[in-house]
Amino acid sequence: MTNIRKTHPLFKIINHSFIDLPAPSNISSWWNFGSLLGICLMIQIITGLFLAMHYTSDTMTAFSSVTHICRDVNYGWLIRYLHANGASMFFICLFLHVGRGMYYGSYTFMETWNIGVILLFAVMATAFMGYVLPWGQMSFWGATVITNLLSAIPYIGTTLVEWIWGGFSVDKATLTRFFAFHFILPFIITALVIVHLLFLHETGSNNPTGLNSDSDKIPFHPYYTIKDILGVILMIMFLMTLVLFFPDLLGDPDNYTPANPLNTPPHIKPEWYFLFAYAILRSIPNKLGGVLALILSIMVLMLLPFLHTSKLRSLMFRPITQTLYWILVANLLVLTWIGGQPVEHPFIIIGQLASISYFSIILIFMPIAGIIEDSLLKFD
């Protein structure tokens, strides 16, 4: 008799996705981050659901409700810090996952890649709105500054901002709608993840060499299920260390002060995972130009399939582009550092140079390096 997992309509889908899925035999630990992101999403949805049971989205009580969760709810402090630091883990895994895709040429799976970029935007939007909910100083002013950027859109900008605010400033209406969107978006993200996997399983996984691996496939279970479990254990150990020993390490002390529209914090800055984009935004003196650069800093990922000039897919055998890739990584770390610094000399010029080099490496130097490497390898 055929196994039920191969015949049952529901189990069959799970079987083809996680059990009998043919996977390349040589995928490294860099391929673990997809499953880790799935675990992160589950952690965020579960902890978020329990937080939503006790949270009130009203300007008068939002801050106190978060305090109440931490003080009075059973293990409320754990749920709250798991959710806050879980977001950081989510972004660490996201950046590594995208970086892996860039290094090994996974962007040639265009549907999978583009849905991945849309997912990145959706997760960033969700995280931004989640940061507003505790209604601390940085929540309020972060929301004010970032939503205000839309006023740079010609003609409709101011109207659009007031429409998003639901009034003439960030207030109760804004907080309520941000809570509503923050609640619904993770479920939209889950649906997008399923589509992301659907397109991935149409082509099969890439591998470190970038070569076709159809002739050398192994079943996902038990090989990669065990490998993924190891990754999950390591990630949870790291997350729990963060939550139980350094819960406020990545947060801003200003957010422990209730929101006050009459008092602006000295340095308004987002969470660490947005700092690179914030640095790019600030490096352009023009408001509309800054907003466009901010959007393009992520949108540029969608151009990667068209900027690929080499006949080799992966960077495994391409030392020149490899060097450029690691310069790009260092450059992003510099941008992250600059995003957290005040707008003064020498940080302004460093930020501008780092922003120019970010776009130059991706749009100019990497495609040229691909052509040079092809000529050196005498492919013609």
Swiss-Prot record:
InterPro entries named in the record: Cyt_b/b6_C (IPR005798), Cyt_b/b6_C_sf (IPR036150), Cyt_b/b6_N (IPR005797), Cytb/b6-like_sf (IPR027387), Cytochrome_b (IPR030689), Cytochrome_b_C_euk/bac (IPR048260), Cytochrome_b_N_euk/bac (IPR048259), Di-haem_cyt_TM (IPR016174)
UniProt remark on cofactor binding: Binds 2 heme b groups non-covalently.
Gene Ontology CC terms, in alphabetical order: mitochondrial inner membrane; respiratory chain complex III
Residue numbers binding a ubiquinone: 201
Any one GO molecular-function label of the UniProt entry: metal ion binding
Extra remark: Heme 1 (or BL or b562) is low-potential and absorbs at about 562 nm, and heme 2 (or BH or b566) is high-potential and absorbs at about 566 nm.
Protein name in UniProt: Cytochrome b
Organism expressing this protein natively: Hylomyscus alleni (Allen's wood mouse)
Gene name for this UniProt entry: MT-CYB
